[in-house]
Amino acid sequence: MLEVLYEDNHIIAVNKKISDIVQADKTGDTPLSEEVKAYIKKKYNKPGEVYLGVPHRVDRPVSGVVIFARTSKALTRLNKMFQEHEKEISKIYWAIVGNLPAEDHAVLTHYLVRDPEKNKSHAYNQPKTGAKEATLEY
């Protein structure tokens, strides 16, 4: 069931659950964007196609807030905002673990390489060509 956190004429923010995908991929699973379109179509009795822009995504294995643009103008403005403030925006991931870590505080750094054929990313301990650095602090 779709959990709408906020909506107005320009944007709609929803809670993405773990394992939901934001946009269609080769898995064929129904993306959150289609669920939001169906919600808007039904709630506002919209005929035809519903416009919905996707200015950002949240990875499939995690939950979080996703903001969708309800108009092309809102999408343009959100894209510009995300681009201009890229260095100020950060993602914070909270993890639930079965056992306490050995240390109370540590910083872990890994290097992520995406495999587009399998639609997965792999983490490495050492830098690799084309890898993106990922840091975890706890």
Task: Name each model feature, range by range.
Residues 1-138:
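RNA pseudouridine synthases
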